[in-house]
């Protein structure tokens, strides 16, 4: 067989040619392979050497502990524009005072424990723990102002130290959990026995009490006033004299009265000792008169004015625990001032935040309430004659302002229903300013040279259970507060003090309750305006009454006219408390002149006769002369009947929510008088 020349399959004879011929040229590549196969070298397996025996490696000691300094208080940062401070973080720290408010106090902490915790900072005067159980807040009063400052600083430092200690303990616990050996306790940068500022072992927070809640009298501030010192005596000489009784904080001289000098001590006990030692003592040929200073005037001029800028940081826990206390009303201020009968804490009217408080008087006092600028060419003589007509019987048309609804304080109270004449309403600068753009209302304004001389006022909507004793107490408190503000202002020496010499509270002799209004004669027109500003449109706060007090001028003006009005009169009653009374000398709260009845008493009618003849009994149950004093509607004359008087009383009661049930509850009246301390 020839090589490569087979004619069949596998070179067998008889097979087709070029079919799967392994020797054919087509099965050989034309070009050599680019990656020729190379034989791999022989690989030997080399196992890893065995590991060395186990050895215990030494553990490096921990780094030495580093004491962390106490971080200082962050600086106060003014709020940026557009940045809203959360409501819970707006805790405002007031100016330095002797009252320190502690927050986050344990709810079971008693007063003695709180006092013991604050004793290291200074002598504690008193502790108020009434809100500890409910809010965890206590107020601590110190004798020394410096002690209060040290307490606030120490309590805050202790609070921050406790926070830093918790941070270090957390870091130590985390490091101990990451390593097996025991981690040494961290070292502190303060002694372990420093427990100052802790209440029952718990850190608290402290800030000064708000100025509105701190008493502003001289006894609480350690402030004295020397009334008749020599004008030539300098404040340095006066400081040397008072320095013998304690550290003096400040000595200053009155700008308007050089003979009056104010001395303020750090410690209230030193001020009390200096008052008792120097009052009445002769110095440089003049007897000294030393007294405590009066409370400051309300408003921005007050010494304890609270700034609305945050002064110190507030701990996060305090933001949820602290609740701002409501500001107390002015009527709740103590009003005794050397008087045993002017009782403290008897709140007769609830002051609102509007302009009706007694502290909203302008610099001009009562005269400012009657100064008007004449517009539209109205003559000053006509305006003065209209305002000064005390008992004129000529009816004056109501002003256009009262016809429109009486915006402001000078408008009509009940619109056209009451029918009060405009000449009996008080006019104030507030009403003039509100209607400055109203040409029609400007016609009723008085010129600046006109002064209202009326002094007798009518107090309306008095609760029917109100007695003459309660009304006297209310007027005494008002006079004391007004006179203290006049003395403290030192702005106008010619400003007259508030006092009154006549009082009449008409009584229904059947049920022994008042008929809803009363009359008071003040000793000056300025005092009448001050009483109007203090009580007009103020809600009463006794006997759950919903009445709103209203003050207007009375029809009969002046003490002499009132005496003539009640001349030869007798009242069918059995008590002098139901009679009109006068005071000589006038009563001002400090001088508690006893009331002297102005009229006599006749035998009281029996209940049987009253039952048999109701109309006659009704006519005799109320004094018919009382109706002639009030400012009746212009449609009725002065001689109104007793029946219309009774209807007027009922109308006032119905309008303000008082019904007949308010009058007949004698048991409730006795309980209220007993609660206020007027009865045993």
Curated annotation (Swiss-Prot):
Plastochron is defined as the time interval between leaf initiation events. Residues 223-295 form the RRM domain. This is Protein terminal ear1 homolog. PROSITE patterns: RRM. The gene is PLA2. Probable RNA-binding protein. Involved in the regular timing (plastochron) of lateral organs formation. May regulate the rate of leaf initiation and the duration of vegetative phase. Seems to be redundant to the function of PLASTOCHRON1, but to act in an independent pathway. Disruption phenotype: Plants produce threefold the number of leaves, and leaf size and plant height are strongly reduced compared to wild-type. Shoot apical meristem (SAM) shows a higher rate of cell division and internode elongation is significantly reduced. Some inflorescence branches are converted into vegetative shoots. It comes from Oryza sativa subsp. indica. Residues 404-413 have a biased composition (Gly residues).
